[in-house]
Amino acid sequence: MSKKIKAGIVGATGYTGVELLRLLAAHPDVEVAAVTSRSEAGTAVADYFPSLRGVYGLAFQTPDEAGLEQCDIVFFATPNGIAMKDAPRLIEQGVRVIDLSADFRIRDIPTWEHWYGMTHAAPGLVSQAVYGLSELNREAVAQARLVANPGCYPTCVSLPLVPLLRQCRLKPGMPLIADCKSGVSGAGRKGNVGSLLCEAGDNFKAYGTAGHRHLPEIRQTIAGLQDGIAEGFVFTPHLAPMIRGMHATVYLHLSDGSDPETVLRDYYRDSPFMDILPAGSTPETRSVRGANLCRISIRQAAQSDVWVVLSVIDNLVKGAAGQAVQNMNIMFGLEETHGLGGIPLLP
């Protein structure tokens, strides 16, 4: 592009915020023009994040001082409940918005208010938001003024299911079970006891067993693609003793004798961030660390009619900031891979 995209990041002091800063620094067509934080206003980005020394000369500003309305696009990497208050004004001024929180993901307002425990401040804008699962909604994302970036668990679980659901290959009335594990960074950067090394290290536990906020988000995607499946969906997340990474093991029943691996390969043939592994492979979280990739394998369980799908992503990249940059590329007519060519880190 002859003119760089001017980007702003609201709430840039969390893990998704610094991941956006890292990825956008390597993007040839983006200039990060504003980064905001009420608590760190006046602090240089490079002082707050030493990993970005020599990369950014910006300082954090309050949202009111940052000139966000002069940006082409603004990313909200904020806690739930912020974007729904601040995004409408920017959209009215012609700024395109990608919200990495959950404010615009769930279309049914009472459902959202039930799971997130607050009154929605911009219910009229929810219907205009495009759900930014890039590989599902490319055409709509390209035209969007507001993109609701998916959650990490919904991304990891939905990507292997989308091709099968679109062809109505899942068997109605049967359980669809997602057994998921996340690294501790998924809990965010704010201090809490459960994220302490002495609590999360050398330990493994389920959480949200009574119901996780990502459950209605995943069910919404399922219900929009095939009838009779969402009602049988069961989702249990676990906290794994690692920093980054997400692993989903999904158990499903197919309605016919088709080869699901072929269905996935055909659907994702032109999707550069999707890697369908050979049958019998077991994708590992370390194989996607730091990269905007989703690796998937699928095989039939021994002596059973149950199929087992394995899906891995980096929860901070494909599960958050990387998918947001991918959506930005689509919105501005760029190649999806632009600025996202990083190779996974190993070890």
Swiss-Prot record:
KW Amino-acid biosynthesis (keyword) present: yes
Gene Ontology CC, one term: cytoplasm
SMART domains with a match to the protein in the record: Semialdhyde_dh (SM00859)
Keywords: Amino-acid biosynthesis, Arginine biosynthesis, Cytoplasm, NADP, Oxidoreductase
GO process annotations (BP): L-arginine biosynthetic process
CDD domains: AGPR_1_C, AGPR_1_N
InterPro entries listed in its UniProt record: AGPR_AS, AGPR_type-1, NAD(P)-bd_dom_sf, NAGSA_dehydrogenase, Semialdehyde_DH_NAD-bd
Record's catalysed reaction(s): N-acetyl-L-glutamate 5-semialdehyde + phosphate + NADP(+) = N-acetyl-L-glutamyl 5-phosphate + NADPH + H(+)
First and last residue of the signal peptide: none
Compartments in which it is found: Cytoplasm
UniProt-listed SUPFAM superfamilies: Glyceraldehyde-3-phosphate dehydrogenase-like, C-terminal domain, NAD(P)-binding Rossmann-fold domains
E.C. no: 1.2.1.38
Function field: Catalyzes the NADPH-dependent reduction of N-acetyl-5-glutamyl phosphate to yield N-acetyl-L-glutamate 5-semialdehyde.
Name this protein carries in UniProt: N-acetyl-gamma-glutamyl-phosphate reductase
